[in-house]
Amino acid sequence: MKKFKLVELIKEAIIKKKGIKLSEYMKMCMTHPDYGYYTKKKPIGFKGDFITSPEISQMFGELIGLWVVKVWMDHNKPSEFSLVELGPGNGTLMADILRSTRKIAEFHKSLKITLIEISPSLQELQKKILKNYSITWKKKLNNLPNIPTTIIANEFFDALPIEQYIFKKSKWMEVIVSLKNSNSKESNEFCFGLKNIPKPLEELSTFTNEENKIYEISPGIKETIIYLSKHLNKNFGACLIIDYGKEDNLGSTLQSVRNHKYSNPLENQGESDLTSLVNFKAIKNCATKSNLVVTDLVDQGDFLSSLGIQERFVALSKNMDKEKVALHISSLKRLIDKNQMGKLFKVMGIRNKNSLPLEGLENK
Protein backbone atom coordinates (compact mmCIF):
# COMPACT_ATOMS: atom_id res chain seq x y z
CA MET A 1 0.00 0.00 0.00
CA LYS A 2 2.80 2.43 0.88
CA LYS A 3 4.45 1.80 -2.47
CA PHE A 4 1.27 2.72 -4.33
CA LYS A 5 0.79 5.80 -2.14
CA LEU A 6 4.24 7.05 -3.14
CA VAL A 7 3.45 6.38 -6.81
CA GLU A 8 0.32 8.52 -6.45
CA LEU A 9 2.28 11.37 -4.84
CA ILE A 10 4.85 11.29 -7.65
CA LYS A 11 2.05 11.19 -10.21
CA GLU A 12 0.36 14.23 -8.62
CA ALA A 13 3.62 16.19 -8.77
CA ILE A 14 4.14 15.24 -12.43
CA ILE A 15 0.62 16.29 -13.43
CA LYS A 16 0.87 19.57 -11.51
CA LYS A 17 4.25 20.53 -12.98
CA LYS A 18 3.91 18.80 -16.35
CA GLY A 19 6.91 16.65 -15.51
CA ILE A 20 9.35 16.79 -12.60
CA LYS A 21 13.13 17.08 -12.34
CA LEU A 22 15.01 13.81 -12.00
CA SER A 23 16.43 15.12 -8.71
CA GLU A 24 12.90 15.68 -7.36
CA TYR A 25 11.88 12.17 -8.39
CA MET A 26 14.95 10.67 -6.71
CA LYS A 27 14.40 12.70 -3.55
CA MET A 28 10.78 11.54 -3.27
CA CYS A 29 11.76 7.90 -3.85
CA MET A 30 14.64 7.94 -1.40
CA THR A 31 13.81 10.35 1.41
CA HIS A 32 10.05 10.98 1.47
CA PRO A 33 9.28 11.23 5.22
CA ASP A 34 6.65 8.48 5.11
CA TYR A 35 7.34 6.32 2.07
CA GLY A 36 10.97 6.91 1.08
CA TYR A 37 13.52 4.12 0.70
CA TYR A 38 15.81 5.36 3.47
CA THR A 39 12.88 6.30 5.69
CA LYS A 40 11.48 2.82 6.08
CA LYS A 41 14.12 0.30 5.01
CA LYS A 42 17.34 -1.07 6.46
CA PRO A 43 19.06 -1.35 3.10
CA ILE A 44 22.67 -2.19 3.96
CA GLY A 45 24.11 -5.66 4.46
CA PHE A 46 23.71 -9.14 3.03
CA LYS A 47 19.96 -9.07 3.79
CA GLY A 48 19.53 -5.59 2.33
CA ASP A 49 19.83 -4.27 -1.21
CA PHE A 50 23.57 -3.56 -1.17
CA ILE A 51 26.69 -4.02 0.93
CA THR A 52 29.42 -1.51 1.72
CA SER A 53 33.13 -1.97 2.46
CA PRO A 54 32.80 -1.69 6.27
CA GLU A 55 30.32 -4.60 6.24
CA ILE A 56 32.74 -6.78 4.25
CA SER A 57 35.65 -6.69 6.69
CA GLN A 58 36.66 -4.99 9.93
CA MET A 59 40.02 -4.21 8.28
CA PHE A 60 38.45 -1.40 6.27
CA GLY A 61 37.29 0.55 9.32
CA GLU A 62 40.45 -0.20 11.27
CA LEU A 63 42.66 1.32 8.58
CA ILE A 64 40.39 4.36 8.22
CA GLY A 65 40.67 4.75 11.99
CA LEU A 66 44.45 4.86 11.82
CA TRP A 67 44.20 7.33 8.93
CA VAL A 68 42.06 9.64 11.09
CA VAL A 69 44.53 9.36 13.98
CA LYS A 70 47.34 10.37 11.61
CA VAL A 71 45.38 13.51 10.63
CA TRP A 72 44.88 14.28 14.33
CA MET A 73 48.60 13.83 15.02
CA ASP A 74 49.53 15.97 12.00
CA HIS A 75 47.50 18.78 13.58
CA ASN A 76 49.58 18.55 16.77
CA LYS A 77 47.11 16.39 18.69
CA PRO A 78 44.49 19.08 19.42
CA SER A 79 42.62 18.68 22.71
CA GLU A 80 39.35 18.98 20.77
CA PHE A 81 38.95 17.24 17.42
CA SER A 82 35.77 16.93 15.39
CA LEU A 83 35.13 13.60 13.63
CA VAL A 84 32.20 13.70 11.21
CA GLU A 85 30.74 10.91 9.11
CA LEU A 86 28.33 11.62 6.28
CA GLY A 87 25.75 8.86 5.77
CA PRO A 88 27.09 6.36 8.35
CA GLY A 89 24.92 3.46 7.18
CA ASN A 90 24.63 0.78 9.85
CA GLY A 91 27.28 2.51 11.98
CA THR A 92 29.83 -0.23 11.33
CA LEU A 93 32.55 2.05 9.97
CA MET A 94 32.43 4.44 12.93
CA ALA A 95 32.28 1.51 15.36
CA ASP A 96 35.42 -0.02 13.81
CA ILE A 97 37.20 3.35 13.78
CA LEU A 98 36.52 3.87 17.49
CA ARG A 99 37.28 0.26 18.48
CA SER A 100 40.59 0.14 16.62
CA THR A 101 41.81 3.42 18.13
CA ARG A 102 40.54 2.96 21.69
CA LYS A 103 44.04 2.47 23.12
CA ILE A 104 45.00 5.97 22.00
CA ALA A 105 43.37 7.57 25.03
CA GLU A 106 44.38 11.14 24.22
CA PHE A 107 42.80 10.84 20.77
CA HIS A 108 39.54 9.44 22.14
CA LYS A 109 39.37 12.13 24.81
CA SER A 110 39.64 14.83 22.14
CA LEU A 111 36.81 13.53 19.95
CA LYS A 112 33.59 15.38 19.23
CA ILE A 113 31.67 12.96 16.99
CA THR A 114 28.88 14.01 14.64
CA LEU A 115 26.92 11.65 12.39
CA ILE A 116 24.88 13.09 9.51
CA GLU A 117 21.98 10.71 8.88
CA ILE A 118 18.58 11.41 7.33
CA SER A 119 17.15 7.90 7.81
CA PRO A 120 15.32 7.25 11.12
CA SER A 121 15.76 3.48 10.79
CA LEU A 122 19.51 3.79 10.19
CA GLN A 123 19.85 6.28 13.06
CA GLU A 124 18.22 3.65 15.25
CA LEU A 125 20.80 1.04 14.18
CA GLN A 126 23.67 3.47 14.68
CA LYS A 127 22.54 4.36 18.19
CA LYS A 128 22.51 0.68 19.14
CA ILE A 129 25.96 -0.16 17.79
CA LEU A 130 27.48 3.09 19.12
CA LYS A 131 25.63 3.25 22.45
CA ASN A 132 28.85 3.47 24.48
CA TYR A 133 30.00 6.70 22.82
CA SER A 134 28.97 10.33 23.12
CA ILE A 135 27.69 11.25 19.66
CA THR A 136 25.63 14.03 18.10
CA TRP A 137 23.23 13.10 15.30
CA LYS A 138 22.09 15.56 12.67
CA LYS A 139 19.85 15.22 9.63
CA LYS A 140 21.64 18.02 7.81
CA LEU A 141 25.25 19.09 7.52
CA ASN A 142 25.43 22.34 9.46
CA ASN A 143 26.78 23.97 12.62
CA LEU A 144 29.77 21.68 13.08
CA PRO A 145 32.06 22.52 16.02
CA ASN A 146 34.63 25.16 15.11
CA ILE A 147 37.65 22.97 15.85
CA PRO A 148 40.04 20.92 13.66
CA THR A 149 37.91 18.44 11.74
CA THR A 150 38.05 15.22 9.76
CA ILE A 151 35.06 14.31 7.58
CA ILE A 152 34.53 10.75 6.34
CA ALA A 153 32.22 10.18 3.35
CA ASN A 154 32.08 6.50 2.41
CA GLU A 155 29.45 5.88 -0.28
CA PHE A 156 27.68 9.12 0.55
CA PHE A 157 27.86 11.23 -2.59
CA ASP A 158 26.57 8.47 -4.89
CA ALA A 159 23.22 8.62 -3.08
CA LEU A 160 22.64 12.34 -3.65
CA PRO A 161 19.97 13.20 -6.26
CA ILE A 162 21.18 14.27 -9.68
CA GLU A 163 19.90 16.35 -12.56
CA GLN A 164 20.50 15.33 -16.18
CA TYR A 165 20.91 17.62 -19.18
CA ILE A 166 21.31 16.86 -22.86
CA PHE A 167 22.62 19.04 -25.69
CA LYS A 168 20.15 18.45 -28.51
CA LYS A 169 19.70 20.39 -31.75
CA SER A 170 22.13 23.08 -30.60
CA LYS A 171 20.39 23.79 -27.30
CA TRP A 172 20.34 22.48 -23.75
CA MET A 173 17.36 20.47 -22.52
CA GLU A 174 16.68 18.88 -19.14
CA VAL A 175 15.77 15.23 -18.62
CA ILE A 176 12.54 14.99 -16.63
CA VAL A 177 10.27 12.23 -15.32
CA SER A 178 6.81 12.14 -16.93
CA LEU A 179 3.79 9.87 -17.21
CA LYS A 180 4.07 7.29 -19.97
CA ASN A 181 0.48 7.90 -21.05
CA SER A 182 -0.19 11.51 -20.10
CA ASN A 183 -3.73 11.34 -21.53
CA SER A 184 -4.81 8.63 -19.11
CA LYS A 185 -5.60 9.49 -15.49
CA GLU A 186 -5.24 5.80 -14.65
CA SER A 187 -1.65 5.56 -15.90
CA ASN A 188 0.91 4.79 -13.20
CA GLU A 189 3.80 4.13 -15.56
CA PHE A 190 6.59 6.67 -15.69
CA CYS A 191 9.02 7.54 -18.47
CA PHE A 192 11.85 9.97 -19.15
CA GLY A 193 11.14 13.08 -21.18
CA LEU A 194 12.85 16.31 -22.21
CA LYS A 195 12.07 19.88 -21.24
CA ASN A 196 13.40 23.16 -22.59
CA ILE A 197 15.32 25.26 -20.09
CA PRO A 198 15.03 29.05 -20.42
CA LYS A 199 18.60 29.75 -19.31
CA PRO A 200 21.47 27.24 -19.16
CA LEU A 201 22.94 26.65 -15.70
CA GLU A 202 26.41 28.02 -14.96
CA GLU A 203 27.75 24.45 -14.67
CA LEU A 204 26.68 23.66 -18.25
CA SER A 205 29.10 26.26 -19.61
CA THR A 206 32.01 23.97 -18.69
CA PHE A 207 30.71 21.10 -20.82
CA THR A 208 31.73 20.33 -24.40
CA ASN A 209 28.26 20.60 -25.98
CA GLU A 210 28.41 17.19 -27.64
CA GLU A 211 25.19 16.51 -29.52
CA ASN A 212 22.86 13.99 -27.81
CA LYS A 213 25.22 13.43 -24.88
CA ILE A 214 23.84 13.40 -21.33
CA TYR A 215 25.57 15.42 -18.61
CA GLU A 216 24.88 15.03 -14.91
CA ILE A 217 24.90 17.65 -12.17
CA SER A 218 24.39 17.00 -8.45
CA PRO A 219 23.18 20.09 -6.55
CA GLY A 220 23.80 18.18 -3.32
CA ILE A 221 27.49 17.66 -4.11
CA LYS A 222 27.98 21.37 -4.70
CA GLU A 223 26.11 22.33 -1.52
CA THR A 224 28.03 19.81 0.60
CA ILE A 225 31.49 20.68 -0.73
CA ILE A 226 30.87 24.43 -0.36
CA TYR A 227 29.98 23.94 3.32
CA LEU A 228 32.91 21.60 3.97
CA SER A 229 35.30 23.95 2.19
CA LYS A 230 34.29 26.91 4.34
CA HIS A 231 34.59 24.76 7.45
CA LEU A 232 38.04 23.34 6.60
CA ASN A 233 39.37 26.75 5.58
CA LYS A 234 38.33 28.14 8.95
CA ASN A 235 39.18 25.22 11.22
CA PHE A 236 41.85 23.13 9.43
CA GLY A 237 41.54 19.40 8.86
CA ALA A 238 40.67 17.03 6.03
CA CYS A 239 37.91 15.17 4.22
CA LEU A 240 38.19 11.57 3.01
CA ILE A 241 35.84 10.56 0.19
CA ILE A 242 35.45 6.91 -0.86
CA ASP A 243 32.90 6.13 -3.55
CA TYR A 244 32.37 4.57 -6.94
CA GLY A 245 32.61 7.13 -9.70
CA LYS A 246 34.66 8.68 -12.45
CA GLU A 247 36.53 11.85 -13.32
CA ASP A 248 33.90 13.36 -15.61
CA ASN A 249 30.15 13.54 -16.03
CA LEU A 250 29.52 12.38 -19.59
CA GLY A 251 26.67 9.90 -20.08
CA SER A 252 23.82 8.73 -17.86
CA THR A 253 24.99 6.86 -14.75
CA LEU A 254 21.64 6.61 -12.96
CA GLN A 255 21.08 3.13 -11.59
CA SER A 256 18.62 1.28 -9.40
CA VAL A 257 19.47 -1.69 -7.17
CA ARG A 258 17.04 -4.01 -5.43
CA ASN A 259 18.04 -7.18 -3.59
CA HIS A 260 21.61 -6.86 -4.92
CA LYS A 261 20.37 -6.77 -8.53
CA TYR A 262 19.96 -3.92 -11.01
CA SER A 263 16.39 -2.85 -11.70
CA ASN A 264 14.43 -0.21 -13.62
CA PRO A 265 14.82 3.18 -11.85
CA LEU A 266 11.26 4.11 -12.87
CA GLU A 267 9.75 1.12 -11.07
CA ASN A 268 9.51 -0.06 -7.44
CA GLN A 269 9.51 3.48 -6.06
CA GLY A 270 10.62 3.54 -2.42
CA GLU A 271 11.70 -0.09 -2.66
CA SER A 272 14.92 0.30 -4.70
CA ASP A 273 18.17 2.16 -4.06
CA LEU A 274 18.69 4.93 -6.62
CA THR A 275 22.28 6.08 -7.10
CA SER A 276 24.66 7.48 -9.71
CA LEU A 277 28.39 7.41 -10.31
CA VAL A 278 30.08 10.22 -8.41
CA ASN A 279 31.53 12.97 -10.58
CA PHE A 280 34.85 13.50 -8.81
CA LYS A 281 35.78 16.27 -11.23
CA ALA A 282 32.86 18.34 -9.95
CA ILE A 283 34.00 17.77 -6.36
CA LYS A 284 37.54 18.80 -7.22
CA ASN A 285 36.47 21.92 -9.11
CA CYS A 286 34.25 23.06 -6.25
CA ALA A 287 36.89 22.48 -3.55
CA THR A 288 39.79 24.04 -5.46
CA LYS A 289 37.72 27.18 -6.05
CA SER A 290 37.70 27.49 -2.26
CA ASN A 291 41.51 27.32 -2.16
CA LEU A 292 41.68 23.80 -0.71
CA VAL A 293 44.15 21.09 -1.71
CA VAL A 294 42.48 18.18 -3.53
CA THR A 295 44.37 14.94 -4.10
CA ASP A 296 44.37 12.95 -7.31
CA LEU A 297 42.02 9.98 -7.42
CA VAL A 298 43.47 6.76 -6.01
CA ASP A 299 41.95 3.29 -6.45
CA GLN A 300 40.54 1.89 -3.20
CA GLY A 301 42.79 -1.16 -3.48
CA ASP A 302 45.93 0.95 -3.74
CA PHE A 303 44.82 3.22 -0.90
CA LEU A 304 44.13 0.34 1.50
CA SER A 305 47.37 -1.37 0.49
CA SER A 306 49.36 1.78 1.25
CA LEU A 307 47.76 1.87 4.71
CA GLY A 308 48.87 -1.72 5.38
CA ILE A 309 45.84 -3.93 4.74
CA GLN A 310 47.97 -6.93 3.76
CA GLU A 311 49.92 -6.70 7.01
CA ARG A 312 46.68 -6.41 8.99
CA PHE A 313 45.31 -9.41 7.08
CA VAL A 314 48.28 -11.54 8.15
CA ALA A 315 47.98 -10.46 11.79
CA LEU A 316 44.28 -11.32 11.96
CA SER A 317 44.74 -14.65 10.14
CA LYS A 318 46.98 -16.05 12.88
CA ASN A 319 44.03 -16.60 15.21
CA MET A 320 41.62 -18.04 12.61
CA ASP A 321 40.67 -21.59 11.65
CA LYS A 322 40.75 -22.68 7.98
CA GLU A 323 37.11 -21.81 7.33
CA LYS A 324 37.49 -18.29 8.70
CA VAL A 325 40.77 -17.78 6.82
CA ALA A 326 39.01 -18.65 3.54
CA LEU A 327 36.32 -16.04 4.27
CA HIS A 328 39.03 -13.58 5.33
CA ILE A 329 40.86 -14.08 2.00
CA SER A 330 37.60 -13.55 0.10
CA SER A 331 36.95 -10.30 2.00
CA LEU A 332 40.45 -9.00 1.30
CA LYS A 333 40.11 -9.73 -2.42
CA ARG A 334 36.73 -8.05 -2.58
CA LEU A 335 38.14 -4.87 -1.05
CA ILE A 336 41.37 -4.56 -3.04
CA ASP A 337 41.15 -6.73 -6.18
CA LYS A 338 41.12 -4.68 -9.39
CA ASN A 339 38.29 -6.83 -10.75
CA GLN A 340 36.15 -6.10 -7.70
CA MET A 341 35.89 -3.04 -5.43
CA GLY A 342 39.61 -2.36 -5.54
CA LYS A 343 39.43 -0.44 -8.82
CA LEU A 344 35.73 0.43 -9.08
CA PHE A 345 35.87 2.45 -5.87
CA LYS A 346 37.96 5.61 -5.82
CA VAL A 347 39.46 7.63 -2.97
CA MET A 348 39.93 11.39 -2.86
CA GLY A 349 41.24 13.61 -0.10
CA ILE A 350 40.54 17.29 0.53
CA ARG A 351 42.49 19.36 3.04
CA ASN A 352 43.30 22.82 4.26
CA LYS A 353 46.29 24.15 2.31
CA ASN A 354 48.23 24.55 5.56
CA SER A 355 47.59 20.97 6.70
CA LEU A 356 50.16 18.23 6.07
CA PRO A 357 49.89 15.85 3.05
CA LEU A 358 47.35 13.07 3.50
CA GLU A 359 48.52 9.52 4.18
CA GLY A 360 48.05 7.15 1.24
CA LEU A 361 46.93 9.93 -1.10
CA GLU A 362 49.85 12.34 -1.52
CA ASN A 363 53.50 11.71 -2.19
CA LYS A 364 55.56 13.01 0.71
Tell me the role of every PLM-derived stretch.
Residues 1-86, 90-140, 146-148, 311, ...:
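Rossmann-like AdoMet
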Residues 29, 151, 283:
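A residue-level signal for conserved active-site and pocket-lining positions in enzyme catalytic cores
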Residues 30-35, 197, 243-247:
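Short glycine-enriched loops at secondary-structure junctions
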Residues 60, 151, 243:
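Conserved RecA-like P-loop NTPase ATPase core
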Residues 120, 157, 246:
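Short, glycine/acidic-enriched loop or turn micro-motifs at the edges of active sites
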Residues 139-141, 146-169, 215-223, 227, ...:
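A short SAM/SAH-binding and catalytic strip from SAM-dependent methyltransferases
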Residues 150-206, 254-264:
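A mobile, often basic/glycine-rich helix-loop segment
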Residues 200-364:
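Long, Lys/Arg- and hydrophobic-enriched amphipathic alpha-helices
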